[in-house]
């Protein structure tokens, strides 16, 4: 669909801008690899919302966007929290059933009383390949999505003035550490206000969805 096209075109633009570097440093590091792709999806969602007055369709667009945010920011972060707990539990001699209990507690903490979770969900962690093949990998999804949301918040405030710095960010590819690349575009990874901007984008989508009253 159009969102997938925007996502993949984002990767293409990122690669083109970074192509001046050697083959060893063209590809962005994991935390920045999804920057242009997810940013492209955000642009498409905003454009569709701007041209849509039907409340039902607006709700669908917002729900899809928020689903993606949850799946990429919260869910992936909780995978890593579970991994930390699981590795400690294994060192303490916990059985597989004990790991299942930890995972179910992990889900219950996420959803509290908003969802009824059946006992079968305790086995879900067994279906997540990253846990076996690339341990502690999933943090990068959370980092990348929240980075894009925070960048998008800045774009909303700055408009055209945002573009040169963003292009400069993508042009680095993987030629430097993420902290250095971001600092050269006036982004301080240690600044809570920058990251809070991403949560403000989420808040805005939730408030609009609630305001539709459907």
Summary of predicted features, one role per range:
Residues 1, 22, 53-58, 191-192, ...:
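Short, structured coil/loop segments at alpha-helix boundaries
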Residues 1, 25, 65-66, 136, ...:
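Non-transmembrane, amphipathic alpha-helical segments
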Residues 4-6, 13, 42, 50, ...:
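C-terminal, non-catalytic "cap/extension" segments appended to globular domains
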Residues 20-30, 61-68, 87, 91:
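Short beta-alpha connecting loops at secondary-structure transitions
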Residues 21-28, 49-61, 158-165:
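Short, glycine/acidic-rich hinge or "gate" loops at secondary-structure transitions
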Residues 29-57, 65-67, 71, 144:
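Post-HExxH zinc-binding segment in Zn-dependent metallohydrolases
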